[in-house]
């Protein structure tokens, strides 16, 4: 799910037959989002290679921004740590990021598109900009037929 950061992604999804899109990370970094400003700032500063998937060994993969916690988690996974050891590491880590703003030990859930987000915007601005850009992309496709 997700993987959409802007109108280009929305247009591509629609041109492939989708009837809607899901945007998560983009709205986590919005002005209305209740996550801690440190979390939002990490998303805004992220580059395209700054996310990583943890939890593959447990069957519950989660994409997050790289930090000390994800490095430790991946190390433990590589060492075949059991579920309880991994669970112990992550217990409360989302709260640490969302409420406390702990960007070192918290889980900073974010999609691969984090690297495309450059500023904090209102939800209204995100939606209007995304729809306008999608309409422009779709209209431009019609001119290339």
Question: How would you label these PLM feature ranges?
Answer:
Residues 1-3:
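Glycine- and other small-residue-rich loops at beta-strand/loop junctions that grip anionic moieties
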Residues 5-145:
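Conserved active-site-proximal phosphate/metal-binding subdomains
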């Amino acid at each position: 799910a997700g993987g959409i950061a802007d109108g280009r992604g929305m247009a591509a999804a629609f041109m492939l037959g989708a009837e809607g899109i899901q945007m998560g990370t983009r709205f986590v970094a919005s002005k209305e989002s209740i996550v801690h400003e440190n979390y939002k700032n990490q998303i805004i500063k992220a580059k395209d290679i700054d996310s990583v998937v943890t939890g593959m060994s447990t069957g519950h993969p989660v994409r997050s921004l790289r930090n000390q916690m994800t490095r430790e988690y991946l190390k433990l996974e590589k060492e075949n740590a059991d579920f309880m050891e991994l669970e112990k590491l992550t217990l409360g880590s989302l709260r640490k990021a969302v409420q406390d703003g702990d960007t070192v030990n918290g889980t900073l859930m974010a999609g691969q598109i984090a690297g495309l987000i450059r500023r904090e915007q209102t939800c209204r601005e995100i939606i209007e900009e995304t729809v306008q850009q999608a309409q422009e992309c779709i209209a431009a496709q019609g001119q290339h037929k």
